Amino acid sequence: MQPELTTSVPLTPLTYARRAEPIELPELMDGPLPYAVIRDYLRDLAKVNRFTRGYKPTLAFLDRIAGSCDACRSVCIRPLRILDVGSGGGDTLRAIAHWAAARNIPVDLTGLDLNPLSTRAAQEFSDKDSSDPKEISAPLVANIHWITGDVFSYSPDNAPDIVLSALFTHHLSSPEVVRFLSWMEHNARLGWFINDLHRSRNAAFFFPFLPILLGWHRFISHDGPVSLRRAFVPEDWQRMLAQANISAATIEAHSMNRLCVARIR
């Protein structure tokens, strides 16, 4: 049985003129939930990403990195190290594994998430995918490293070449986003990419109908509009990039209400 839909809502109205901070407008998935609920939610969230082609901006960024002569030359003697922060159920990294296998690009993939139950779900999903002999990415998926931890405490022996995040930054407070930008700028050797949502009243209004029509987890009907309310507009990113003293990043609007930030060295 799934928990009841309960959440704290702000007592004063929030407008779309500004971003709602996570503490003002929590998602149901922000609270403590049993593993079965988290697993089912993350499985259906992957369906949302596939339906909305949410991986497309991230894979296009990787194509740009792979097409850079300087980048290829700097890592040609070893696999490209890619870190996905806030990896959730791991569907983005599994999509990247397929991308890399199709292009014969050696990669070393790591997923980092604060929630140990998300890490557990990512491993479970990956074990299933890697057992499919028809899947060209199965060997890469089997070797994805799933780590539980706080990104700001994460200090690997070998720095990542690329740091990615997908639908992660809207879970952070605005000061934490600035800190995350600085962390990526300091740690990513070749570049970094944020794939998140564009704050939109219209998208928030229409989104709840999709889970009902397509049979997705009922929490998604609630959390989708909340995520859109906690999301960003270009002016937000301009301000936070300035606060992080980053001038070389680009802000990119993509289809299906995605707003991304890219940095290639």
Question: For each of these PLM feature ranges, what is it?
Answer:
Residues 188-197:
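Conserved beta-strand signature within the Rossmann-like core of class I S-adenosyl-L-methionine
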Residues 164:
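A conserved beta-strand element that flanks and buttresses the S-adenosyl-L-methionine
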Residues 28, 35-69:
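Class I SAM-dependent methyltransferase Rossmann-like catalytic core
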Residues 1-31:
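N-terminal auxiliary segments of SAM/dcSAM-dependent transferases
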Residues 83, 89-132, 140-153:
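Class I SAM-dependent methyltransferase SAM/SAH-binding core
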